[in-house]
């Protein structure tokens, strides 16, 4: 059993939004962030003075599009040359360049310096935010977490997500697949209804990724039969279509192109995202953006039918993986008991209709919250792994599968599969190979994942060499190759020459794109440094606010007629002068250090407090002397101002 202080959390690290849950009081609590939202934008922004994560980052994106990073999940574990990365770069306002080993690196300006971050580092910042949200709620530090990934994530994407966890200072107990996590939420929701074995299809369409998994659930055993999907299809692709549509409309109406105006595009994208959501519940909506480009106001309407038409190819594409999982699981669609919707994009009526038509009019299951189901399942798995949960969850068993076939290259560039796709993990497969030529001193083991017959069409995961094979005719040496997948879906491969006893192995961690231990350690240190800087900024803001509050509250106090009568003219002028000087100083020194603000506060208190206490002693108001607390609580006419961001 884990000790009480070792509470583990479940994090749904999403493309556009993330969510965190924890098992407590015999159920899962989905934890709201400091803004009261139960999901947090997966956004990180860098400014001249600070780093922002979550809602704060997304709220200022229109003012700072080049330095606000999102969609790190669409980059993680991919190469810069990947066609999907190249097409995404066209839509992103931030700059992505090719780093060492073709790793995509995100370039931003932070504190007036150019900085490069890997997708793992950006994701780790979002994970730190989710960790802090949980810590604020639980009132203690959190070390352990279960983090989810799309079921269709390949080996390098899983490994990179695990690295992001390490950089954030979390101990990632397990990486689990999002649809499987959602199935746990569904299974617990339906726990009372004991109806033997059920075939359940999880349809998970989020902001940037799409998964379909088919499971059988029986008495707390969740067995994934097949999984399919697209790690590059989601709500953002529907937003992109809307943005392109309105850019063309603006060009047509006003003969001007906004494609080069990053701020205008961002404001348009925000409006498109809002319009898309509105169209899930109404048949038509309008987009109104003041002064979008060169002072021109933009006003347009969009109907649900038009939105559906411009995305119909993508919507139809969502049905292909559904057919694929049924085929792989050798099931007819009539034997699916429940179709469960997960992910915000499943709220789109057309997608629901296509899915319902596919299943011959079957009612879809909407009983679980599509935004929170994945974090819910991850929190349950975290409780199981730390021995936290009650009997209700401790007897759950998850049997997941490898999403892609794994094998190695044999003579002639042929893909020889050792572990076929949809094999239950963890698993281990061994096969004996031999040499291709006489007296061959070594063999090159090249490990691939994918479904094609030729290795050149599949994804190379890694290579290693087995040397020191004694001279022998071709086909004589016995080389035993072992593929071993752990519970996170990460692969270890070893090869051994049985006769000579030579052995070599590799953990497939995509040598080219993978971060080394040293790099991860350096990133951990960087993360701590950034966190310390964030703390410093927070302290500065607090110190500045205390000073401002005190000054404005003092001003209000001496404006109160009842109290002002008790002050001599000289004292009143003395306080007014001190307050005016302080406010002027604040306006000219917004970026001053904490101790400067604190010094100014002491200085101002030194002038005001003696006068105020003298005033109260001279037969003051019945309440006695107000403390600093009373001053700072009244909010003041001035105080820190907030500004609406479009």
Swiss-Prot record:
Subcellular location: Cytoplasm
UniProt keyword list: ATP-binding, Chaperone, Cytoplasm, Nucleotide-binding, Stress response
GO cellular component: cytosol; plant-type cell wall
Triggers of expression: By heat shock. Up-regulated by virus infection.
Statement: the UniProt record of this protein carries the keyword Cytoplasm: yes
Region (Disordered): 626-646
Stored InterPro entries: ATPase_NBD, Heat_shock_70_CS, HSP70_C_sf, HSP70_peptide-bd_sf, Hsp_70_fam
Major site of localization recorded for this protein: cytoplasm
Family statement drawn from the similarity comment of this UniProt entry: Belongs to the heat shock protein 70 (TC 1.A.33) family. DnaK subfamily.
PANTHER family: HEAT SHOCK PROTEIN 70KDA (PTHR19375)
Job description of the protein: In cooperation with other chaperones, Hsp70s are key components that facilitate folding of de novo synthesized proteins, assist translocation of precursor proteins into organelles, and are responsible for degradation of damaged protein under stress conditions.
Name the UniProt record assigns to this protein: Heat shock 70 kDa protein 5
Organism: Arabidopsis thaliana (Mouse-ear cress)
Taxonomic lineage: Eukaryota, Viridiplantae, Streptophyta, Embryophyta, Tracheophyta
């Amino acid at each position: 059993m884990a000790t009480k202080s070792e509470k583990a959390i479940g994090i749904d690290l999403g493309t556009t939004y993330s969510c965190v849950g924890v098992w407590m009081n015999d159920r899962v609590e989905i934890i709201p962030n400091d803004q009261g939202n139960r999901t947090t934008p997966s956004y990180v922004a860098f400014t001249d003075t600070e780093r922002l994560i979550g809602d704060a980052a997304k709220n200022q994106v229109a003012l700072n599009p080049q330095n606000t990073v999102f969609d790190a999940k669409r980059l993680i574990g991919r190469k810069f040359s990947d066609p999907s990365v190249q097409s995404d770069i066209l839509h992103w306002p931030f700059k992505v360049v090719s780093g060492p080993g073709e790793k995509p690196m995100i370039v931003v300006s932070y504190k007036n310096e150019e900085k490069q971050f890997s997708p793992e580092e950006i994701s780790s910042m979002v994970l730190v935010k989710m960790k802090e949200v949980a810590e604020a709620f639980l009132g203690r530090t959190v070390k352990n977490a279960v983090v989810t990934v799309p079921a269709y994530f390949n080996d390098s994407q899983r490994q990179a997500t695990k690295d992001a966890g390490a950089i954030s200072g979390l101990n990632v107990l397990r990486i689990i697949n999002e649809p499987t996590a959602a199935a746990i939420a569904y299974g617990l929701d339906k726990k009372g209804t004991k109806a033997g074995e059920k075939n359940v299809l999880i349809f998970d369409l989020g902001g940037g990724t799409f998964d379909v998994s088919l499971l059988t659930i029986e008495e707390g055993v969740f067995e994934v039969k097949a999984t399919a999907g697209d790690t590059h299809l989601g709500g953002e692709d529907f937003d992109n279509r809307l943005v392109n549509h309105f850019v063309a409309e603006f060009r047509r109406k006003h003969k001007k192109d906004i494609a080069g105006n990053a701020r205008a595009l961002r404001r348009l994208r925000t409006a498109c995202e809002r319009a898309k959501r509105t169209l899930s519940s109404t048949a038509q909506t309008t987009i109104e953006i003041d002064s979008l480009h060169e002072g021109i106001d933009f006003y347009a309407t969009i109907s649900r039918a038009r939105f559906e038409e411009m995305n119909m190819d993508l919507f139809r594409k969502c049905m292909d993986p559904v057919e694929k999982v049924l085929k792989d699981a050798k099931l007819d669609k009539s034997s699916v008991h429940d179709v469960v919707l997960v992910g915000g994009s499943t709220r789109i009526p057309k997608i629901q209709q296509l899915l319902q038509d596919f299943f011959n009019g079957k009612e879809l299951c909407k009983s679980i919250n599509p935004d929170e189901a994945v974090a819910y399942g991850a929190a349950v798995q975290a409780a199981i792994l730390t021995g936290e949960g009650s009997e209700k969850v401790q007897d759950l068993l998850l049997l997941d599968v490898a999403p892609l076939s794994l094998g190695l290259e044999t003579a002639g560039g042929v893909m020889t599969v050792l572990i076929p796709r949809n094999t239950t993990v963890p698993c281990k497969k061994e096969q004996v190979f031999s040499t291709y030529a006489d007296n061959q001193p070594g063999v090159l083991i090249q490990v691939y994942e994918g479904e094609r017959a030729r290795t050149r069409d599949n994804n190379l995961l890694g290579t290693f060499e087995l040397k020191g094979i004694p001279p022998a005719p071709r086909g004589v040496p016995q080389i035993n190759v072992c593929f071993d997948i752990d519970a996170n879906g990460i692969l270890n491969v070893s090869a051994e020459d049985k006769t000579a006893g030579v052995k070599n192995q590799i953990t497939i961690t995509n040598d080219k794109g993978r971060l080394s231990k040293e790099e991860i350690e350096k990133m951990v240190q960087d993360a701590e440094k950034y966190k310390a800087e964030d703390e410093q900024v927070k302290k500065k803001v607090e110190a500045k606010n205390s000073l401002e509050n005190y000054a404005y509250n003092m001003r209000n106090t001496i404006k109160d007629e009842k109290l002002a009568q008790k002050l001599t003219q000289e004292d009143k002028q003395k306080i007014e002068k001190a307050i005016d000087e302080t406010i002027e100083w604040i306006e000219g020194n917004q970026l001053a250090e904490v101790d400067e603000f604190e010094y100014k506060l002491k200085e101002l208190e030194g002038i005001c407090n003696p006068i105020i206490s003298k005033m109260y002693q001279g037969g003051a108001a019945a309440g006695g002397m107000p403390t600093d607390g009373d001053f700072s609580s009244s909010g003041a006419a001035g105080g820190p101002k907030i500004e609406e961001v479009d």
